[in-house]
Regions:
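Metallocofactor- and cofactor-centric catalytic cores in central/energy metabolism, strongly enriched
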Residues: 1-202
Length: 202
């Protein structure tokens, strides 16, 4: 669904429709794990992590927040009602109070995404400029470890005189020779009970 939303947010027809409603264009931002996916594959900016999802609504600049089946704070519904934000759920097993439900289905993904993007555009006119506050804090990040990302990193450390460039061969050689004895994935959402990213950095 996120991929299709990105497609329609970039569609010239939808952009023209947004401009006809007074917007400068369409901005899609991601939160949590889906954010990592669309940031890695499409360069879509991240608005925050799991713990920051409510802050996205608090900016007053979010026309719609769309969720699927996990990592959803129950307060998003009531919070969205305090602003103009449309809170949209897309999974029948994760419908929530104070949300609008658009059932996502792979067979109708394009239709679902177009409806969601149009709903967000139509909601732009309800934005209250006096409530909009977008923090100017920005942070660089490396997101996603696709094969392409790994190859790029490996090319940066490989010896161009002897190593084959543009492949995962340097990593494979390090693993098979025992230089690298394993890999660890540090994954999971932050927990409101502990300091953010505590499990990852300490």
């Amino acid at each position: 669904l996120s991929e299709m939303i990105c497609e329609y947010a970039d569609d010239p027809e939808m952009i023209a429709y947004a401009k006809s409603k007074g917007a400068k264009g369409i901005t899609v931002s991601g939160v949590c794990c889906t954010s990592n996916e669309v940031a890695m594959r499409r360069g879509i900016p991240m608005a925050g992590n799991f713990l920051q999802q409510e802050n996205v609504v608090l900016t007053g600049a979010c026309e719609a927040i769309v969720v699927d089946v996990q990592c959803i704070f129950p307060a998003l519904g009531p919070l969205s009602k305090c602003f103009h934000t449309k809170f949209i759920t897309t999974s029948p097993i994760a419908q929530m109070p104070d949300s609008e439900f658009i059932r996502f289905n792979a067979a109708t993904a394009a239709e679902n995404a177009k409806a969601i993007v149009k709903m967000a555009i139509d909601n732009f006119e309800n934005r209250k400029p006096e409530l909009v506050h977008i923090p100017q804090m920005k942070q660089k990040a490396t997101v996603g470890y696709s094969v392409e990302a790994l190859v790029k990193v490996l090319d940066g450390v490989a010896n161009t005189q002897v190593d084959e460039m543009g492949t995962t061969k340097p990593l494979i050689v390090c693993i098979t020779s025992g230089v690298i004895r394993g890999a660890v994935a540090m994954v999971g959402c932050n927990n409101p009970k502990i300091r953010p990213d505590y499990a990852h950095i300490e």
